[in-house]
Amino acid sequence: MSKLVKLFITSISAITLALVSFTSSFAKVEGDYIVLGSAISLTGKYSSNGVHTQNGYNLAVERINKMGGVNVGGKSYKFEIIYYDDESNPKRAAQLAERLIKQDGVHYMLGPYSSGLTKAIAPVTEKYKIPMVEANGASRSLFTKGYKYLFAVLSPANQYLEVAIDLAVEKNGGKPVRIAQAFEQDAFSQDVRLGILDAAKRTGSKIIIDDKLPKELNDMAATLA
């Protein structure tokens, strides 16, 4: 099983644990099904990863349902998911989260793809006290706002490459290393960058290149020269 699929199954499993913690009256139930909601990127710039995300959610739900679903309040339920295409647009994602909660009546959400879209939806789920488990939003700022209804199954972006710096220092006999980095200026990429800066300071390593890349980049020759 691929790492990506395992991540999505972990996401659904986290929702399952949350469900077991509540009574069945809290969730939207249609017959023997508990209905989850997800605004996901099926079109637009995130569509490729959005479709992968949807496929992962569907695979996890299929496996859980085949195993008999989950037990809530002494009764077994299976999952189904209502999807809407957020078009890779934060404003649209927030609107669809409102629709899923207010019109479709879902009481549990699965997160979108990307930190930006997760940031757009999180205030909505927080407003309505709807738990959202997400596996694709890693920006550090998501976890510094005191959200009580946002649950992530991955580490924050600032931790992504810290271990790489630690490993490089270890392989260098414990001595500081020279680091070259180049990142786009979006929130996620800059969070990864800040993690490297922290690791460099901690290990006494030196940043020799710290380039900020434009949004549309076709040539990195200047950085690599």
Which ranges hold each PLM region?
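Short, low-complexity disordered leader/linker segments with a strong preference
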Residues: 1-35
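Beta-alpha junction/loop-to-helix N-cap segments that form part of ligand/metal-binding clefts
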Residues: 28-29, 35, 48-55, 67-144, ...
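Acidic/histidine-rich, surface-exposed loop or edge segments in extracytoplasmic proteins
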Residues: 37-45
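Glycine- and acidic-residue-enriched helix-capping/strand-helix junction motifs
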Residues: 45-55, 187-192
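Extracellular/periplasmic Venus flytrap/periplasmic-binding protein
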Residues: 140-141, 148-225
